[in-house]
Amino acid sequence: MKVPEDLVLVGYISGAYGLNGWVRVRPYSADADALLTAKTWWLDKPEFHDVEMMQSKIHTGDVVAKLMGVAGRDAAEALKGATVQIPRSHFPALSDNEFYWVDLIGLEVENLQGEHLGQVSDMMDNGAHPILRVAVPQAAETTDPKAAPQELLIPFVEQFVITVDRTAKKITVDWGLDY
C-alpha cells in the first residue's frame, strides 16, 4: 500500500495486552477516537508498514487493539515502542467549532488590530484548557544568533480566540503584542 501523505502521529505501542496478541497503545491525545475508528494504522517497527486494526477499545486511559497478523503475546511485545500513525483523512468528522490540534499547527495568528503575532507552532493543555503556542517572528535587526525565539502562549478559549479560518489558514485573537 502507498504511504498516505497526511499521516499524523497519534500514539505509541507501550506493550502487550493479554496473551492473544493485543497491543496497548498510549495515545498522545486525551481523545483517542482516531485510534478507535481508523481501520489502517501505520507502524514504524520492525520497519515502516501498514497494518489492519481489527478491534479496539479504551482500557484505563489507553487503547488496546487487536492487529492483523499479531498472533500472540510475543508478537505484541515485539512491537513495543513502535509509533502509531493514522491518515488525517481517517479521523472522525467534527462539528463546526471543533478542531483537531494537528489542523491548527502552522496557522498564522493575528489580533483584532490586524497585527501579525506569529504562527502556531504547537498546542498544549494546562488542565483547564488548551493553549496555543505561537512562535513570534524574530525581528530582522536581531543579529544575536543565541537570541531565544520568542513565543506567545494564548489560551484557546472563546474569550481570546475570535475566529479560526482553516481555509485562510488564520486565527484571529483578542490578544495584544505586549501581553
From Swiss-Prot:
One of its GO terms (cellular component) is cytoplasm. InterPro entries: PRC_barrel-like_sf, PRC_RimM, RimM, RimM_N, RimM_N_sf, Transl_B-barrel_sf. One of its GO terms (biological process) is rRNA processing. The keyword ATP-binding does not apply. It holds the Pfam family PRC_RimM. GO terms for molecular function: ribosome binding. Gene3D superfamilies: PRC-barrel domain, RimM. It is found in: Cytoplasm. SUPFAM superfamilies: PRC-barrel domain (SSF50346), Translation proteins (SSF50447). Residues 96-179 form the PRC barrel domain. Keywords: Chaperone, Cytoplasm, Ribosome biogenesis, rRNA processing. The keyword Iron does not apply. Belongs to the RimM family. PANTHER family: RIBOSOME MATURATION FACTOR RIMM (PTHR33692:SF1). Binds ribosomal protein uS19. The PRC barrel domain binds ribosomal protein uS19. An accessory protein needed during the final step in the assembly of 30S ribosomal subunit, possibly for assembly of the head region. Essential for efficient processing of 16S rRNA. May be needed both before and after RbfA during the maturation of 16S rRNA. It has affinity for free ribosomal 30S subunits but not for 70S ribosomes. NCBIfam families: 16S_RimM. HAMAP family: Ribosome_mat_RimM (MF_00014). This is Ribosome maturation factor RimM. It comes from Janthinobacterium sp. (strain Marseille). The gene is rimM.
